[in-house]
């Protein structure tokens, strides 16, 4: 069953979808389209490539800032599509869904579909409960204005991203604690195999831009 949580001042009991939605609406929400899923992947990378092309043809501060904003948005889009892949929603074929989610969405933005799926499904099972792995993201709020300002500034200046990259690489390599996740060993934040996939996919991006004589574009697309 798919369960829906309606959040009010108090956590209400779980409801089955057919208690709030019609059968037609449930079928519509559950429907998957291979064409739409793959088209969304193509769209994300097409927009990234187009942004780089526009800046290359008209290099100035305005096209640079526009490209940075658009590419950042599509990187977020890839992460969102990885979320869909973690739920098996990109394509009907499970193996194809996992490969596309991992190599086209997750690895280029330094993430991992399998590791994300492992904890994210726990989030759905325990939304806003003590066992919710995402509880730390919402529990501190509301926060004081000074605290909120610090959070915003950390994001604007990339501090949050650098911390995530540090944890991703060094905790993965150095931590020894392991656990099983879909048949894989997970060390630290992600498995070492995942780390290699991230590095490999970003090397592809790096050498693609390098072949066009623009090595530094990887900073915008890869990071």
What are these regions (language model features)?
Residues 75-94, 115-128:
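Acidic (Asp/Glu-rich) catalytic motifs at the cytosolic membrane interface
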Residues 2-72, 106, 110-220:
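Non-catalytic, topology-defining segments of multipass membrane proteins
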Residues 92-106:
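Post-HEXXH active-site segment of zinc metalloproteases
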Residues 57, 87, 96-97, 137:
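Residues in and immediately flanking transmembrane alpha helices
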